[in-house]
Amino acid sequence: MNDIETVALVGNGNVAMVLGSAWQRQGIHFAAFCNRSATLPVGLERKDAQIISDPGQIPSDVDAILVAVTDDAILEVMKQLPSRPLVIHFSGCLPDPVQAGGVLWPIQSIVQNSKSMHNGFPIALSCSNSAHKAMTKFAKLIASELHELSEIERQTAHLAAVFAANFTNHCFAIAQELCQRAALPWNLFQPIARQIIEQAVEGTSKQRQTGPAIREDQSAIDAHLGLLAQRPEFEPIYTAMTKSIQSLHQATETP
Protein backbone atom coordinates (compact mmCIF):
# COMPACT_ATOMS: atom_id res chain seq x y z
CA MET A 1 0.00 0.00 0.00
CA ASN A 2 1.25 3.48 -0.91
CA ASP A 3 1.95 6.20 1.63
CA ILE A 4 -1.01 8.39 2.56
CA GLU A 5 -0.38 11.72 0.86
CA THR A 6 -3.78 12.73 -0.56
CA VAL A 7 -6.98 12.40 1.46
CA ALA A 8 -10.66 13.30 1.60
CA LEU A 9 -12.14 14.52 4.88
CA VAL A 10 -15.72 13.74 5.90
CA GLY A 11 -17.10 15.92 8.70
CA ASN A 12 -16.66 19.47 9.98
CA GLY A 13 -16.75 19.14 13.77
CA ASN A 14 -13.89 19.49 16.27
CA VAL A 15 -12.15 16.26 15.25
CA ALA A 16 -12.29 17.16 11.56
CA MET A 17 -11.05 20.69 12.17
CA VAL A 18 -8.27 19.92 14.66
CA LEU A 19 -6.87 16.74 13.08
CA GLY A 20 -7.41 18.00 9.55
CA SER A 21 -5.48 21.19 10.30
CA ALA A 22 -2.69 19.20 11.94
CA TRP A 23 -2.23 16.98 8.88
CA GLN A 24 -2.52 19.91 6.50
CA ARG A 25 0.31 21.66 8.36
CA GLN A 26 2.39 18.53 7.77
CA GLY A 27 1.88 18.72 4.01
CA ILE A 28 -0.99 16.28 3.52
CA HIS A 29 -3.06 17.25 0.47
CA PHE A 30 -6.84 17.40 0.87
CA ALA A 31 -8.60 16.57 -2.38
CA ALA A 32 -12.13 16.86 -0.99
CA PHE A 33 -14.05 18.10 2.02
CA CYS A 34 -17.41 16.41 2.54
CA ASN A 35 -20.08 17.39 5.07
CA ARG A 36 -23.84 17.93 5.12
CA SER A 37 -23.55 21.71 4.73
CA ALA A 38 -20.90 21.47 1.97
CA THR A 39 -18.67 23.97 3.76
CA LEU A 40 -14.93 24.25 4.34
CA PRO A 41 -14.09 23.20 7.92
CA VAL A 42 -12.82 26.08 10.04
CA GLY A 43 -9.03 26.35 10.10
CA LEU A 44 -8.38 24.40 6.90
CA GLU A 45 -7.33 25.76 3.52
CA ARG A 46 -9.34 24.81 0.48
CA LYS A 47 -6.61 25.15 -2.16
CA ASP A 48 -7.88 22.96 -5.04
CA ALA A 49 -10.16 20.71 -2.97
CA GLN A 50 -13.72 19.82 -3.89
CA ILE A 51 -16.37 20.76 -1.32
CA ILE A 52 -19.29 18.35 -1.46
CA SER A 53 -22.16 16.99 0.66
CA ASP A 54 -22.48 13.47 -0.79
CA PRO A 55 -19.91 10.91 0.44
CA GLY A 56 -20.54 8.94 -2.74
CA GLN A 57 -18.97 11.77 -4.76
CA ILE A 58 -15.60 11.55 -3.02
CA PRO A 59 -12.85 10.92 -5.60
CA SER A 60 -11.86 7.26 -5.64
CA ASP A 61 -8.20 8.04 -6.35
CA VAL A 62 -7.40 9.52 -2.92
CA ASP A 63 -5.05 7.51 -0.72
CA ALA A 64 -7.43 7.58 2.26
CA ILE A 65 -10.82 8.84 3.37
CA LEU A 66 -10.86 10.32 6.88
CA VAL A 67 -14.28 9.83 8.48
CA ALA A 68 -14.46 12.41 11.27
CA VAL A 69 -18.16 12.37 12.14
CA THR A 70 -20.12 11.39 15.25
CA ASP A 71 -20.01 7.73 16.27
CA ASP A 72 -23.69 7.34 15.39
CA ALA A 73 -23.03 8.49 11.81
CA ILE A 74 -19.80 6.62 11.03
CA LEU A 75 -21.25 3.31 9.83
CA GLU A 76 -23.89 5.01 7.68
CA VAL A 77 -21.26 7.26 6.07
CA MET A 78 -18.98 4.30 5.39
CA LYS A 79 -21.75 2.54 3.45
CA GLN A 80 -21.78 5.44 0.98
CA LEU A 81 -18.03 5.68 0.35
CA PRO A 82 -16.18 4.58 -2.78
CA SER A 83 -14.84 1.06 -2.31
CA ARG A 84 -11.22 1.61 -3.31
CA PRO A 85 -9.61 4.06 -0.85
CA LEU A 86 -8.37 3.20 2.61
CA VAL A 87 -10.95 4.26 5.22
CA ILE A 88 -9.88 5.70 8.58
CA HIS A 89 -12.20 6.71 11.41
CA PHE A 90 -11.40 8.24 14.78
CA SER A 91 -13.83 6.58 17.19
CA GLY A 92 -12.52 4.97 20.34
CA CYS A 93 -15.46 2.60 20.78
CA LEU A 94 -16.60 1.49 17.30
CA PRO A 95 -15.20 -1.60 15.54
CA ASP A 96 -12.40 -1.39 13.00
CA PRO A 97 -13.63 -0.77 9.44
CA VAL A 98 -14.62 -4.01 7.69
CA GLN A 99 -12.82 -3.06 4.49
CA ALA A 100 -9.09 -2.42 4.44
CA GLY A 101 -8.53 0.45 6.80
CA GLY A 102 -8.29 1.23 10.45
CA VAL A 103 -8.77 3.55 13.38
CA LEU A 104 -6.68 6.42 14.70
CA TRP A 105 -8.17 7.35 18.07
CA PRO A 106 -6.75 10.50 19.73
CA ILE A 107 -6.28 9.71 23.42
CA GLN A 108 -7.11 13.28 24.34
CA SER A 109 -10.14 15.54 24.39
CA ILE A 110 -10.15 17.36 21.06
CA VAL A 111 -10.71 21.07 21.64
CA GLN A 112 -10.28 23.86 19.13
CA ASN A 113 -7.64 26.52 19.83
CA SER A 114 -6.04 24.44 22.59
CA LYS A 115 -2.28 24.99 22.77
CA SER A 116 -1.74 21.32 23.61
CA MET A 117 -3.19 20.38 20.22
CA HIS A 118 -0.24 22.03 18.46
CA ASN A 119 2.34 19.96 20.35
CA GLY A 120 1.01 16.60 19.21
CA PHE A 121 -1.02 14.16 21.26
CA PRO A 122 -1.08 10.40 21.87
CA ILE A 123 -2.90 8.33 19.29
CA ALA A 124 -4.08 4.71 19.44
CA LEU A 125 -3.75 2.78 16.19
CA SER A 126 -5.69 -0.33 15.17
CA CYS A 127 -5.73 -1.38 11.54
CA SER A 128 -5.57 -4.17 9.00
CA ASN A 129 -2.17 -5.68 8.24
CA SER A 130 -2.23 -4.28 4.71
CA ALA A 131 -2.70 -0.73 6.02
CA HIS A 132 -0.25 -0.93 8.92
CA LYS A 133 2.81 0.67 7.34
CA ALA A 134 0.92 3.51 5.65
CA MET A 135 -1.24 4.31 8.68
CA THR A 136 1.70 4.22 11.07
CA LYS A 137 3.62 6.74 8.99
CA PHE A 138 0.51 8.90 8.57
CA ALA A 139 -0.28 8.90 12.31
CA LYS A 140 3.28 9.77 13.30
CA LEU A 141 2.99 13.04 11.39
CA ILE A 142 0.84 14.47 14.20
CA ALA A 143 1.20 12.05 17.15
CA SER A 144 3.39 12.70 20.17
CA GLU A 145 3.08 8.98 20.97
CA LEU A 146 1.65 6.11 18.94
CA HIS A 147 0.16 3.08 20.71
CA GLU A 148 -0.84 0.00 18.72
CA LEU A 149 -3.97 -1.52 20.26
CA SER A 150 -6.26 -4.33 19.23
CA GLU A 151 -9.91 -3.49 18.68
CA ILE A 152 -10.95 -4.71 22.15
CA GLU A 153 -7.98 -2.96 23.79
CA ARG A 154 -8.93 0.31 22.12
CA GLN A 155 -12.58 -0.03 23.13
CA THR A 156 -11.58 -0.77 26.74
CA ALA A 157 -9.18 2.19 26.71
CA HIS A 158 -12.01 4.41 25.47
CA LEU A 159 -14.25 3.24 28.32
CA ALA A 160 -11.46 3.98 30.82
CA ALA A 161 -10.98 7.42 29.26
CA VAL A 162 -14.66 8.24 29.75
CA PHE A 163 -14.31 7.51 33.47
CA ALA A 164 -10.93 9.25 33.79
CA ALA A 165 -11.71 12.35 31.76
CA ASN A 166 -15.38 12.88 30.87
CA PHE A 167 -16.91 11.79 34.17
CA THR A 168 -14.18 13.45 36.22
CA ASN A 169 -14.69 16.72 34.35
CA HIS A 170 -18.43 16.47 35.01
CA CYS A 171 -17.80 15.98 38.73
CA PHE A 172 -15.62 19.10 38.72
CA ALA A 173 -18.42 20.97 36.91
CA ILE A 174 -20.90 19.93 39.62
CA ALA A 175 -18.46 20.98 42.35
CA GLN A 176 -17.96 24.36 40.67
CA GLU A 177 -21.72 24.93 40.45
CA LEU A 178 -22.20 24.06 44.12
CA CYS A 179 -19.47 26.56 44.99
CA GLN A 180 -21.08 29.26 42.85
CA ARG A 181 -24.47 28.73 44.50
CA ALA A 182 -22.85 29.07 47.94
CA ALA A 183 -20.63 32.02 46.89
CA LEU A 184 -17.52 29.96 47.65
CA PRO A 185 -14.35 30.81 45.70
CA TRP A 186 -13.24 27.90 43.51
CA ASN A 187 -9.58 28.57 44.32
CA LEU A 188 -10.22 27.02 47.75
CA PHE A 189 -10.34 23.67 45.99
CA GLN A 190 -7.48 24.03 43.53
CA PRO A 191 -4.92 22.32 45.84
CA ILE A 192 -7.13 19.26 46.37
CA ALA A 193 -7.93 19.14 42.65
CA ARG A 194 -4.21 19.11 41.83
CA GLN A 195 -3.63 16.41 44.48
CA ILE A 196 -6.30 14.18 42.93
CA ILE A 197 -4.83 14.62 39.45
CA GLU A 198 -1.32 13.82 40.73
CA GLN A 199 -2.60 10.61 42.35
CA ALA A 200 -4.31 9.65 39.11
CA VAL A 201 -1.12 10.21 37.11
CA GLU A 202 0.79 8.07 39.61
CA GLY A 203 -1.82 5.31 39.29
CA THR A 204 -2.56 5.27 43.02
CA SER A 205 -6.14 6.59 43.07
CA LYS A 206 -7.70 3.50 44.61
CA GLN A 207 -5.14 3.21 47.40
CA ARG A 208 -5.57 6.88 48.33
CA GLN A 209 -9.36 7.03 48.38
CA THR A 210 -10.67 9.20 51.22
CA GLY A 211 -14.03 10.67 52.21
CA PRO A 212 -17.26 9.65 53.93
CA ALA A 213 -18.05 6.83 51.48
CA ILE A 214 -14.94 4.75 52.23
CA ARG A 215 -15.26 5.56 55.95
CA GLU A 216 -18.95 4.59 55.80
CA ASP A 217 -19.72 7.84 57.63
CA GLN A 218 -23.50 7.76 57.20
CA SER A 219 -24.17 10.96 59.12
CA ALA A 220 -21.92 12.91 56.73
CA ILE A 221 -23.52 11.20 53.73
CA ASP A 222 -27.01 12.09 54.98
CA ALA A 223 -25.95 15.70 55.55
CA HIS A 224 -24.65 15.94 51.99
CA LEU A 225 -27.86 14.47 50.58
CA GLY A 226 -29.80 17.06 52.55
CA LEU A 227 -27.75 19.86 50.98
CA LEU A 228 -28.55 18.44 47.55
CA ALA A 229 -32.28 18.96 48.06
CA GLN A 230 -32.04 22.14 45.98
CA ARG A 231 -30.39 20.21 43.13
CA PRO A 232 -32.12 16.81 43.27
CA GLU A 233 -30.65 15.75 39.90
CA PHE A 234 -27.24 15.48 41.61
CA GLU A 235 -28.51 13.14 44.36
CA PRO A 236 -28.48 9.94 42.23
CA ILE A 237 -24.92 10.74 41.15
CA TYR A 238 -23.80 11.19 44.76
CA THR A 239 -25.56 7.99 45.84
CA ALA A 240 -24.20 5.93 42.93
CA MET A 241 -20.65 7.19 43.49
CA THR A 242 -20.89 6.43 47.22
CA LYS A 243 -22.07 2.87 46.55
CA SER A 244 -19.41 2.38 43.87
CA ILE A 245 -16.59 3.46 46.20
CA GLN A 246 -17.83 1.15 48.94
CA SER A 247 -18.35 -1.77 46.55
CA LEU A 248 -14.92 -1.41 44.94
CA HIS A 249 -13.10 -1.41 48.26
CA GLN A 250 -15.20 -4.18 49.81
CA ALA A 251 -14.46 -6.38 46.79
CA THR A 252 -10.74 -5.77 47.29
CA GLU A 253 -10.91 -6.64 50.97
CA THR A 254 -12.90 -9.85 50.45
CA PRO A 255 -10.53 -12.86 50.75
What residues fall within each predicted segment?
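Short amphipathic alpha-helix with an adjacent loop that forms part of the alpha/beta core around
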Residues: 55-61, 79
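Internal alpha-helical scaffold of NAD(P)-dependent oxidoreductase catalytic cores
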Residues: 29, 115-201, 243-244, 249
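Glycine/small-residue-rich loop that forms an oxyanion/phosphate-binding "nest" at active or ligand-binding sites
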Residues: 64-119
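Short, charged/polar "capping" segments at the starts of alpha-helices
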Residues: 38-43, 95-98, 131-133
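Active-site regions of enzymes building and remodeling cell-envelope glycoconjugates
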Residues: 45-53, 84-88, 98-107, 140-146
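Interdomain hinge/lid region at the active-site interface
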Residues: 194-255
